[in-house]
Regions:
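Secretory targeting and sorting signals
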Residues: 1-26
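Second-shell loop/turn segments in exported
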Residues: 22-28, 42-51, 88-98, 102-105, ...
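A short alpha-helix/helix-coil micro-patch that ends at or immediately precedes a cysteine
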Residues: 27-68
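Residue-level "edge-of-site" marker
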Residues: 54, 79, 131
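Short, surface-exposed glycine/acidic/tryptophan-bearing loops
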Residues: 57-101, 118-120
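Disulfide-stabilized extracellular recognition modules
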Residues: 98-150
Length: 150
């Protein structure tokens, strides 16, 4: 291999290491949902929520727990690390093969209890989790969003 080729290869490898890790996750369905929720809040005069790694983790963990246990419902206690003084949870299940982020948000917005959490100005952090799989034998998308205030 010529010296020029080795230098080009080295430059490409170094450049690939410098790309922020968040870029891959920025296009994930969970990141898209958080952007849609923030747009929904901002359209109603509220500030956007900050994404929390801890709330992302707890949301994803609980979505997986529901999918694998066959239970769909709110949990009694949200298990998120960090010092949150207040936490909220919304969940949604979509049956079928098509992931519909907008449909999940519309379902929450049309539910008074869920909409109250979406538009609660006391929350400043958010996390989203999505698990897709089989729930009682049917293809299902399971959403969980956790909201927090420190």
């Amino acid at each position: 291999m010529t010296r020029l080729r080795m230098l080009v290869l080295a430059a490409v490898l170094i450049a690939s290491l410098l790309v922020p890790a968040g870029n891959a996750a920025a296009d994930s369905p969970a990141a898209k949902m958080i952007r849609k929720v923030n747009a929904y809040r901002q359209h109603r005069g509220l500030r956007p929520l900050h994404q929390s790694r801890s709330l992302n983790h707890s949301s994803h963990r609980y979505a997986g727990q529901m999918m694998h246990s066959g239970y769909f419902g709110h949990q009694a206690r949200i298990r998120a690390s960090g010092r949150f003084k207040r936490l909220g949870e919304i969940i949604e299940m979509h049956r079928g093969h098509r992931l519909d982020i907008g449909g999940a948000l519309r379902a929450w917005a049309n539910s008074p209890g869920h909409n109250a959490i979406l538009l609660d100005g006391n929350f400043s952090y958010v996390g989203a989790g999505l698990v897709e799989g089989r729930f009682h034998g049917r293809r299902t998308s399971m959403w969980v969003m956790h909201f927090g205030r420190k």
